[in-house]
Amino acid sequence: MADIQNISLDSPGSVGAVAVPVIFALIFLLGMVGNGLVLAVLLQPGPSAWQEPRSTTDLFILNLAVADLCFILCCVPFQAAIYTLDAWLFGAFVCKTVHLLIYLTMYASSFTLAAVSLDRYLAVRHPLRSRALRTPRNARAAVGLVWLLAALFSAPYLSYYGTVRYGALELCVPAWEDARRRALDVATFAAGYLLPVAVVSLAYGRTLCFLWAAVGPAGAAAAEARRRATGRAGRAMLAVAALYALCWGPHHALILCFWYGRFAFSPATYACRLASHCLAYANSCLNPLVYSLASRHFRARFRRLWPCGRRRHRHHHRAHRALRRVQPASSGPAGYPGDARPRGWSMEPRGDALRGGGETRLTLSPRGPQ
């Protein structure tokens, strides 16, 4: 990465020295609280039989939250110090480690988003054939592979940065010569941004094309069923992937502009650099907001963290289990085998059977639109 990333142009009393700590403090607090709540939601124990098993999407979201939390905890405070202070105060080891963690977590996030997009594509395009592949065990193996690849791609950054003396000050700056730095920065853009974004775009694009490829009324009904099958989780992960592309795009564009364009050192270019970093770092605190807004399932699980939410959920599932105990096991009305009943109908006991004291007969009765 370019030298300009790690040399502050502002003095401690300037506007930048005041604004940067405030912006980074907000990113730090929101990211810690938001991703901490995501971990709490996904790691909450299953005290009863109605707790659903952890899905592959849950495991990938959990991995994203871990990567974001590591980034915010280990990187954001030190980057704020780089922008605020005139010198690097933490030594050569921390200088190398912080920048290694920045790229390690960036690669982990981008590769995880690519894995999620492929998982969603298989779930929609090949729901039956991919069932044996899309298991929690294989998802954990995929997460391990993501971190292994992230470690391999980010390993060069352990020697990329170092500390140098500049008069009486010690600075944390790139230590490689320009040719090697340019090659690594371009490789990081290609492998850590361009390739994952291309995979995500292709996977979600093919998924959407498949969902909307309906011919005739039967095809439209099948497409609608498939769209419902994707659920809000798929839309939430699509929003997360789009946010990643939008937040990290200016950061990589600025680096490429530095190497291949005209990048004069000025307050304007410094402001662009600062804005691109703030936008990239803010990506780690925006994902929990997307989950809470786009996923009704996530909000329901979040409410279970609190005593009142657990009581409501337990009461709901007790009623659901009671209904299932009286539900026929094998047949429904003509044309709706098993439990495949049309929306707007419910299983209810006939009132005359209850009044007569005889055997309860279950019939389908209209509930009205939902």
UniProtKB/Swiss-Prot annotation:
This is Galanin receptor type 3. Glycans are attached at residue 6. Receptor for the hormone galanin and spexin-1. Residues 1-20, 79-96, 160-184, 258-259 are extracellular. The chain crosses the membrane at residues 21-41, 58-78, 97-118, 139-159, 185-205, 237-257, 260-280. PROSITE patterns: G_PROTEIN_RECEP_F1_1 (PS00237), G_PROTEIN_RECEP_F1_2 (PS50262). Residues 317-370 are annotated as: Disordered. It is a multi-pass membrane protein. Keywords: Cell membrane, Disulfide bond, G-protein coupled receptor, Glycoprotein, Lipoprotein, Membrane, Palmitate, Receptor, Transducer, Transmembrane, Transmembrane helix. Its main location: membrane. InterPro entries: Galanin_rcpt (IPR000405), Galnin_3_rcpt (IPR003908), GPCR_Rhodpsn (IPR000276), GPCR_Rhodpsn_7TM (IPR017452). Disulfide bonds join 95-172. PANTHER family: GALANIN RECEPTOR 3, LEUCOKININ RECEPTOR-RELATED. It comes from Rattus norvegicus. A lipid is attached at residue 308 (S-palmitoyl cysteine). The gene is Galr3.
